[in-house]
Swiss-Prot record:
Keyword Transport carried by entry: yes
Biased composition (Basic and acidic residues): 68-77, 147-165
Single GO MF descriptor: RNA strand annealing activity
Name assigned to this protein: 60S ribosomal subunit assembly/export protein LOC1
Record GO biological process: endonucleolytic cleavage in 5'-ETS of tricistronic rRNA transcript (SSU-rRNA, 5.8S rRNA, LSU-rRNA); endonucleolytic cleavage in ITS1 to separate SSU-rRNA from 5.8S rRNA and LSU-rRNA from tricistronic rRNA transcript (SSU-rRNA, 5.8S rRNA, LSU-rRNA); endonucleolytic cleavage to generate mature 5'-end of SSU-rRNA from (SSU-rRNA, 5.8S rRNA, LSU-rRNA); intracellular mRNA localization; mRNA transport; negative regulation of translation; ribosomal large subunit biogenesis; ribosomal large subunit export from nucleus
Gene name linked to the record: LOC1
Compartments it resides in: Nucleus, Nucleolus
Native source species: Candida glabrata (strain ATCC 2001 / BCRC 20586 / JCM 3761 / NBRC 0622 / NRRL Y-65 / CBS 138)
Record's compositionally biased regions (Basic residues): 166-178, 194-203
InterPro entries per UniProt: Loc1 (IPR037650)
Similarity annotation: Belongs to the LOC1 family.
Keywords: Coiled coil, mRNA transport, Nucleus, Ribosome biogenesis, Transport
Length: 203
């Protein structure tokens, strides 16, 4: 607590001056006087002139340093607050949409039935059973791949046939046009010959 000091003068005033205990107490005042005037060191050291020149030269040669990229919550894809996150459920990113299969596509249906519960169901089976099941799945996948390859090949053959037909039609059209041109040239030359023949009339 500070000590209250009354001011004395010719006319006593009712003013009171409150002085801190540090200055009132002699021991405290001496300790304060002996303490060095320390200022807090700044976290960043001031750059040296030589260092600054070096950095400037480096910037001229190689360009400025890239600033450290700061990411927002949206970039980091953090879950928003007050939102329940279901454990084990991962939202799929990227391509959205469903892959539809034909109703009578038994191969794909069998493969899906065999593989759909592998990740989530705790199947207790022996190694031999597991190997058999995986072999069946592999066989189904192989058949699917073969079918896709056959479909691609048939599509390619159809395209080839179509191109062949187009080229043959174009070839026949070119031949026909050439024949027509030759016929036209022949008829025009015949007309010119007939015109050149002199006709003699007797009176």
């Amino acid at each position: 607590m500070g000590s209250i000091k009354k001011t004395k003068g010719k006319s006593q005033s009712t003013k009171r001056v409150v002085t801190p205990e540090v200055f009132a107490d002699q021991q405290a005042r001496n300790q304060l006087a002996n303490a060095p005037n320390l200022t807090e060191k700044s976290e960043r050291r001031k750059a040296n002139k030589l260092q600054v020149k070096k950095e400037q030269a480096r910037a001229r040669l190689y360009g400025k340093k890239k600033k450290e990229s700061t990411y927002s919550e949206k970039d980091l894809d953090l879950p928003s607050l007050n939102k329940a996150v279901n454990p084990g459920v991962k939202l799929r990113r990227g391509k959205k949409g469903k892959k539809f299969i034909d109703d009578h596509d038994s191969l794909t249906l069998h493969r899906l039935i065999k593989t759909i519960g592998d990740k989530y169901d705790d199947i207790t089976e022996s190694k031999l059973e597991k190997d058999r099941r995986l072999e069946v799945i592999r066989e189904l996948k192989r058949q699917e791949i073969e079918r896709k390859e056959a479909a691609k090949q048939s599509q390619l053959e159809e395209k080839k046939d179509e191109l062949k037909k187009k080229s043959s039609i174009a070839r026949s059209m070119r031949r026909k046009n050439r024949r027509d041109q030759e016929r036209d040239l022949h008829t025009t030359s015949n007309d010119k010959v007939q015109r050149k023949k002199k006709s003699v009339s007797f009176a």
